[in-house]
Amino acid sequence: MTELDFIAALRALATQPAARGLADDAAVIEFGTETLILTKDMMVEGVHWLPQQSLADVAWKLVAVNLSDLAAKGAAPVGVLVSHMLGDADEGFVAGLREVLETYATPLLG
């Protein structure tokens, strides 16, 4: 299956209006007069960051790319949810995460 075939298969599953045909990586959910925008980007070692990179920088980039998606939609962040798989190298990641969250005044929600 090619990447385009894979995306087409996902689009067939994403029938909820908030998915907007998977036009981008943000979902837009309407609650009466309020709008909630959700986004989630994943980063893969060797693709989005190199093994020798500082994990503090990796954490920074992970949050920043998601905050950028929200900004592109004109949304202000309520907070971020983070997941990662880094083995035993958590300290640097936590330091970078703390820094980027403080810089953008965005709370960690989970």
Language-model features: where?
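Extreme N-terminal cap/leader segments of soluble proteins
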Residues: 1-54, 73, 82, 88, ...
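Small-aliphatic-rich amphipathic alpha-helix that forms the alpha element of a beta-alpha
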Residues: 56-79, 95-103
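Short glycine/threonine-rich loop-to-helix capping motif typified by GTGT followed
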Residues: 87-95
